[in-house]
A protein has these predicted regions:
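N-terminal secretory signal peptides
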Residues: 1-3
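N-terminal export signals
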Residues: 7-28
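C-terminal segment of N-terminal export signals and the immediately downstream linker at the start
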Residues: 22-64, 81-88, 366
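Gly/Ser-rich catalytic/binding loops embedded in alpha/beta enzyme cores
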Residues: 56-61, 65-294, 401, 406, ...
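Serine-dependent amide/ester hydrolase catalytic core
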Residues: 133-134, 371, 384, 417-420, ...
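Acyltransferase
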Residues: 140, 145-151, 177, 364-365, ...
Length: 571
């Protein structure tokens, strides 16, 4: 049987010859001869055309390896591999010698805010979880009432925003009814009990389609709950919608169109956690769950003006969620306040024995932590990098000034030496394997045809180069550990990508994803067009509590997170 072109080229990729013409020329010779094996003459001819010289001994050795491996690759490709099958190699962001605080302390939430039910319950659509929870706890509103309010808003506004793939009305009503019965019986589970939320459609929810934003999976039902979904159910939360993801976790375009930014319907919401960013900003859910590999929580949160938390790698189980990159994927909350993010993280974090990268490190949240005791850095090179928007620069400067006014002294920090490591080598190297089947089996159904082209090209990524990129990543992690020895948290301007470029901020997003450090993005003003602007906080590995405490103090001293897109506000 003649091998296919991909398995043939894979052998030369492993030899480091993929970037040359040699593999392609040799494949052409193989097709021309209509044979299933390679001959010495074919190797010599292909080498000559490619401008490479091999000795007779090298050709003899290569010939045996080429033909032997062709058979191995062909057999390997016959093995069905579900996206959920992970390699037995687990990334750990902790470097040798690093000390992690594993002592568990009491979870200390902030004092519940005063909440009075508005005459029109839709007036609570933009309330944070902490305030919605008070309505439920004090029995001023039922979970069923809040659920119907959010379901109605989803049905009315989703046609404009394209932020929900599936509205889970039947499930939501059942869960809300159960929550109300438990609360009436005195079994209150905590601040998420009865709160309606949405989850990015990379996460499985039993009984409903999990589409990954891709047309080939429009009707595909994964008959299990992702760990984040089951843990939120245990906390009493109510699932009202599967929210959009960019196709196969890329950008904000999916098979139904482009998810819109509630602040400006001519713009996309960014991605790939496009639906969570849009729906949370528009007041269509109480909170949402997003995922990130290289910016997919931070970017839509910042663009849509919500508070987005990307936890430490290994904090939250990815079980039941689509894999893009085993060593980079993370799951986290997208909310309307920092305190909300802390409450949701507390519910979803910790080992489940299903995702072996998750570590047993307690989340010791203390809403009243004295932030004056924190060592706070700022990435000077990023703040010194003037953008195309004077207003964004002014907002960054004002945020630093406000944080200093809270009794914090800022320390200059700089990114590590190997910060220019291309995260794409790892994302696309692993993603090419993880998403091989949907891209190869029904490529004509994908919205992003460039994804197919890239997938084919990246079959030629040499294994040696991928592994060496991971080794450079180790150096980067060690360097970052030294940076974080001097600070508990550091501040960075938000990475707006092409909107208002800041190369250092963009590099920070890449670096902290590679090293696994947590980040939270919070609103800090508006630009000249009236679109939200944001600030990024970076914490130590498993140091979300300190990072969120500083972000909460900043948020409480400002009111930017209380601003909402006028098109979706109901008086």
């Amino acid at each position: 049987m003649m091998p296919d072109r991909r398995s043939f080229l894979a052998y030369f990729s492993g030899l480091g010859l993929a970037p040359t013409l040699f593999p392609g020329v040799l494949w052409g010779k193989l097709e021309e001869e209509k044979t299933a094996s390679v001959t010495k003459e074919m190797l010599r001819d292909a080498a000559a055309v490619a401008g490479i010289t091999f000795t007779g001994e090298q050709i003899d050795r290569m010939l045996e390896g080429v033909n032997k491996n062709l058979a191995h690759y062909e057999e390997l490709r016959k093995v069905p591999l579900d996206n959920g099958v992970a390699p037995p190699l687990y990334f750990n962001p902790i470097v040798p010698g690093m000390k992690i605080d594993r002592a568990k302390r009491t979870f200390h939430a902030g004092r519940p805010p005063h909440a009075t039910r508005p005459r029109n319950l839709e007036g609570a659509a933009f309330w944070p979880v902490t305030k919605l929870a008070e309505l439920i706890r004090t029995k001023q509103a039922s979970s069923a009432e809040l659920t119907e309010m959010y379901l109605d808003r989803l049905k009315r506004h989703n046609p404009r925003l394209l932020c929900a793939v599936t509205i889970t009305g039947d499930l939501a009503r059942r869960q809300a009814r159960e929550a109300d019965q438990e609360i009436a019986a005195g079994r209150y589970r905590g601040p998420l009990h009865g709160i309606p939320y949405g989850v990015k459609d990379l996460c499985a929810a039993k009984g409903y389609p999990t589409t990954w934003g891709a047309a080939p999976f429009k009707s595909r039902v994964i008959d299990k709950d992702a760990t984040v979904v089951s843990r939120l159910r245990e906390a009493g939360a109510v699932l009202v919608a599967k929210l959009t993801t960019g196709e196969l976790a890329l950008d904000d375009v999916w098979f139904g169109g482009q998810t819109k930014n509630p602040w400006d319907l001519s713009m996309g919401s960014q991605g790939s956690s496009a639906g969570p960013g849009s729906a949370t900003a528009a007041g269509l859910v109480g909170f949402s769950i997003g995922t990130e590999t290289g910016g997919s929580i931070l970017e839509p949160s910042g663009i849509c003006g919500v508070t987005g938390l990307r936890p430490t790698y290994g904090r939250v189980s990815r079980y039941g969620a689509m894999t893009l990159t085993w060593s980079l994927d993370k799951i986290g909350p997208m909310c309307r306040s920092v305190e909300d993010c802390a409450l949701v993280l507390n519910a979803i974090q910790g080992p489940d024995d299903l995702d072996l990268t998750v570590q047993e490190v307690p989340f010791n949240w203390d809403a009243d932590l004295d932030i004056r005791k924190l060592r706070v850095g700022y990435l000077r090179a990023a703040f010194s990098n003037t953008r195309q928007s004077a207003q964004v620069d002014a907002n960054d400067a004002a945020a630093l000034e406000k944080i200093c006014s809270l009794g914090v002294k800022l320390i200059e920090v700089a990114l590590p030496e190997h910060s220019d490591l291309d995260i794409g080598i790892i994302i696309y190297g692993e993603g090419n394997a993880a998403l091989k089947d949907p891209v190869e089996t029904q490529p004509e159904l994908l919205v992003r045809q460039d994804r197919v082209t890239n997938q084919n090209a990246l079959r030629l990524l040499p294994a040696v180069e991928y592994l060496n990129a991971q080794r450079v990543r180790t150096l980067l992690m060690q360097e970052m550990a030294r940076v974080m020895e001097n600070v508990d948290v550091y501040l960075v301007p938000f990475d707006y990508g092409d909107y208002t470029p800041n190369p250092v901020a963009t590099m920070n997003t890449s670096v902290t994803n590679l090293t696994g450090h947590p980040c939270v993005v919070v609103p800090h003003g508006f630009n000249e067009k009236g679109d939200p602007t944001s600030l990024t906080f970076v914490g130590k590995l498993f140091g979300e509590a300190e990072m969120l405490a500083l972000a909460r103090a900043y948020q409480n001293a400002t009111e930017w997170h209380l601003k909402h897109p006028p098109l979706f506000v109901t008086i």
